[in-house]
Each structure stands twice: as C-alpha cells, then as structure tokens.
Regions:
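Low-complexity, glycine/serine/threonine/alanine-rich intrinsically disordered linker
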Residues: 1-471
Length: 471
C-alpha cells in the first residue's frame, strides 16, 4: 500500500483546551470546503489513474551533489572531496546535501509524479565509533530552514549505505542531513573539521513504483469494468462509509455517474467523479450519529478514538452481534494491542505534552556543548514512551508525578548517566536511590520545553504545569 500524510493538504483543525479533537470546536469555512474538494480530487486522480505510470531511473554521484553553498569547500559545513560529498554538521542551513540532474546546474532534482520511489544510497561514516543517523527531508536545499523531515535512517557502524522507499508527490525536492552530527556546522575555511562526518558517493532514484496493475485499490473500487451507475455508487459508498446511503442521497450520486457515462467518459473517469463527490460530502467528512448511539456507531466512535481510523471487520462484527454493547472491554484490549493504537498514543501525547515543540529552539550550543542533535530528538520521545509503557502494562498514571524508573534509549541513558541501553528502542531503566529523574517534570524534554535556549524559566514551567497537568 501507499502511505501518505494528507494533513498538509488541509487546514489545521481548531484547537480547544490544547486538543484538536473537540467536536464543539469544529468549524467548516468556505476555505475548508474548497480544501476538502481539492484533496478529494488529489486522492481520486491517484487512486484511479487512466494509465500505468512510467517507472524511471535516475543516477547521481558526487558531481551532481550540492550543499549549503555550491562547491562549499571552505565555505560551509559540507564540501566535495574527490568522489564523495561530505556532511559535518546537523543544522541543515550549515550542512545539507541535495542534488541536480545536470552537474553544472544548481537546479535541484524535482519528483515528476506522485507515487512510491526507491532510494538506493551509498554512504558511510568517517571517524565514527558508533552508528549514525541520516535525515531525509523535503525542501529546497538552498532554503533549508523550511525543511520538512520525513524519515530518519539509522546506519549501523560500518554500514556502506541504505535503501528505503518513500511516498512522494509531484514537485517534491529531497535533501539529506547528518542528524547525529556532534556539531551544528560551521565555516571550514579557517578551521577544518576533524570529527565524525558522513560521506555520500552515489544515489539511485527509481519510481514511481507499481507492484501490480491494476493496483489493489483499483480492483477494490472497480472489481469489474462494466459496472452500472447504481453498482458503482453503492460500491464506493460502502468502501468509504461502511453503511448504505439513503435513497435520496444515493440518487444524487447516481446522477453524477450517469452524466459521466452519457458524456462518454471511461469507467475510471466516472469512478473518479463519484469518489470526489463522496469524499467531499457530509457522509464522509462528518461522522453522523443517532441521538442514542447504536452499536455500530459505538464501534466507529471507539475506533476513531483508539486507532484514528475506521473500525475493522472484527469490531464491526462485535457491534452487529450485540457483543460490543454488552461488554466492550475485550475489544478495547484487543485494539490497544494492535499497532494502529500507536496513532492514538502519538496524537494524544503530542497534544497533551506538546512533544512537537520540544525542539522548537536551542539548546544554545555555545552553552550546552555536549548536547547532540539526536539526544534532543530522544528527549521529545520520552514522554510518549512513558505513556505507552503505562498503558501497555496497565500501570498507575501516578508514575507521571513520580516514578522509580525512566524510559530511555541508548542516547538518553548516556545523557542521564544511567546504565547502558542498547539501541534506539526505549526500555524501562531503574533509577538509583534518591534520584530526582522520576516523573514527567524531571524529564529532559519537559525541562527543555519549559526553558529558553540557554536558561531555565520557572514561571513558564509553573504555568505549563497548571494548564496541562492540573487543569
């Protein structure tokens, strides 16, 4: 399947009490309606294309690579060295790698069409005794302060490169950063860089990839190529809403299909029109509920709460049989064990604990010289991992106030001075007696969130606790 984040195509949801899930805070402006329609068209055109996309290949070497300054030797935190391009710092505006088709041009390579692309990168670390992390970003390498990080690639010590697949849209530009660098990056004209660095020698881009044709989505929407307008509408409506349309509503969508059919449009084009209309309709945008919830509506509410997605077959079967209405605890436990529950954990802790703001600024590297970029990234994940652990083990939420353990990975354990942890995964680590690291307010991420880039801020910290913990 194709994984793609559509939130960037829609206006942000209105926030009430720190969360964007309150129904009473929902607004539907003309701008939002147009955004839904535009997004619906974007989705339909890519789910039901008229022809199989052509898969192409592009090869890039050091001659095609550019950095924070074109031919940045002596000018920035990156430079070309024979057959390699070298990154030394973690701040993208001082050290990043992007690439162009023409070696003599600085026009950055642009993704030509929506789809899945495979990146095969030859790269290795230099003067490093441990694994490193490469960041893949969207954005113009000449304006890296606007980068959007879309994936981080851990590279084990001794690794010679990596292969990954990304879902990209037309117009996207790619750039690489050295996210685990020890320094933010600086001019190399006066003082050469002697620490760990990442060397890139070759990259191959292949895409858009099409595993099979027609695709799984096309077969699901159009199981046959001679569907009648009524069949087509019923099929798409069932896939989107999991419930039948009323006769009056169904009639309107059938008319759209018939109009397309009469105009001589292909079956794919007709299906696109119906899909766009349904995606932008209240039947899909709103979750309609009865004054007294039915079991099926309860299943939808539970699923969107714990999975941020529509219910699966097992949950709908439990609702249809009446089992969900009698006792939902079994289904709740099953759903929390499903990987999709990670969406709820991510979303809830991001908004409640403001994890996405931990790295908004700082720390000032002139003051905190030993804090590395990936350590700060780990700080932002600690609150999420503590919540996940308490939820999975059914532990008391009092651990957020005080605890005799912390959730840490290798970098955070090293930063806290705790026993060594192997790898990037977070595990519970027992705290020594009289340690003050237990609980949310002692987490490095929380302390950074409620500080400036160079000093603590007790007033800001106290205000945050009152608003988010005791409100």
């Amino acid at each position: 399947g194709v994984n793609f984040d559509f939130t960037g195509l829609l206006p942000p949801d209105h926030v009430e009490h720190g969360f964007d899930k309150f129904g009473e805070g929902r607004l539907m402006s003309p701008h939002q309606v147009m955004a839904y329609l535009k997004t619906a068209r974007f989705v339909a055109e890519r789910l039901l294309p008229d022809a199989k996309p052509e898969t192409r290949h592009w090869d890039f070497n050091a001659n095609h690579f550019h950095g924070s300054k074109n031919f940045a030797t002596g000018g920035g935190g990156d430079y070309r060295d024979r057959d390699d391009y070298v990154l030394t710092g973690f701040r993208p505006y001082r050290s990043n790698l992007h690439f162009s088709i023409d070696p003599e041009s600085h026009d950055q390579f642009v993704i030509p069409a929506f789809g899945v692309y495979r990146l095969e990168v030859k790269a290795h670390s230099e003067k490093s005794k441990e694994g490193e992390v490469i960041g893949i970003n969207l954005g113009d390498g000449r304006h890296p302060t606007n980068f959007q990080m879309i994936r981080r690639i851990p590279m084990a010590h001794g690794s010679k490169g990596f292969t990954t697949e990304l879902t990209l849209k037309a117009g996207d530009q790619l750039a690489f950063t050295f996210d685990s660098a020890r320094v933010p990056g600086r001019s190399l004209a006066k003082k050469p860089h002697n620490g760990p660095a990442m060397r890139f020698s070759h990259m191959k881009v292949t895409g858009p990839l099409t595993e099979q044709w027609p695709t799984v989505a096309m077969k699901a929407i159009l199981p046959k190529q001679d569907m009648k307008p009524t069949e087509l509408v019923d099929r798409i409506a069932l896939l989107l809403t999991q419930r039948p349309l009323t006769m009056e509503d169904r009639k309107a969508f059938v008319e759209i299909a018939r109009a397309q059919e009469k105009s001589g449009a292909s079956m794919a084009a007709t299906a696109r029109s119906v899909l766009i209309a349904l995606l932008a309709s209240p039947h899909f945008i709103y979750k309609a509920e009865s004054p007294e919830l039915t079991d099926v509506e309860r299943a939808y509410r539970l699923s969107y709460f714990l999975w941020n997605s529509a219910p699966d077959t097992a949950l709908l079967n439990a609702a249809s049989s009446g089992a969900l209405g009698k006792d939902s605890s079994g289904e709740v436990e099953r759903m929390l064990k499903d990987p999709k529950a990670g969406r709820f954990i991510d979303d809830f802790t991001r908004q409640w604990l403001q994890r996405d703001k931990v790295d908004d600024f700082g720390p000032d590297v002139r003051v905190f010289k030993n804090v590395r970029r990936m350590t700060v990234d780990s700080m932002g994940r600690e609150g999420r991992e503590l919540f996940r652990h308490l939820l999975e083990k059914n532990l008391s939420m009092e651990h957020f106030i005080d605890s005799d353990f912390v959730m840490a990975n290798d970098r955070l354990a090293r930063f806290y001075g705790l026993p060594a942890v192997k790898g990037d995964a977070f595990v519970p680590v027992k705290l020594p007696n009289k340690s003050e690291r237990g609980g949310l307010v002692a987490q490095a991420g929380f302390l950074k969130l409620t500080s400036t880039d160079f000093a603590t801020s007790p007033i800001h910290r106290g205000s945050w606790i009152l608003k988010n913990l005791y409100n």
